[in-house]
């Protein structure tokens, strides 16, 4: 029964088509945001690595361990 339902549905109203359109719109939105930020200047907000960037900004070079200390710990 479910298979017949899937076959009867048109491609415009199918779940796969709707999902594809959502992904396409999301990609278009991210691209347009990146272009706008590039034109206006400024940092681009990265969704997946934001916490890493914040953490790396607080590290100072004088706080990093020396290579000898790292070898001793190994």
UniProtKB/Swiss-Prot annotation:
> What do the Gene Ontology cellular component annotations say?
extracellular region
- Induction / repression: By bacterial infection.
Tell me where it resides.
Secreted
For the region Disordered, what residue ranges are annotated? Answer: 51-74
Tell me which domain of life the UniProt entry assigns to the organism this sequence originates from: Eukaryota
Point out the signal peptide segment. 1-13
State whether keyword Signal applies: yes
Protein name, per record: Cecropin-P4
The primary gene name is: ASCEC-4
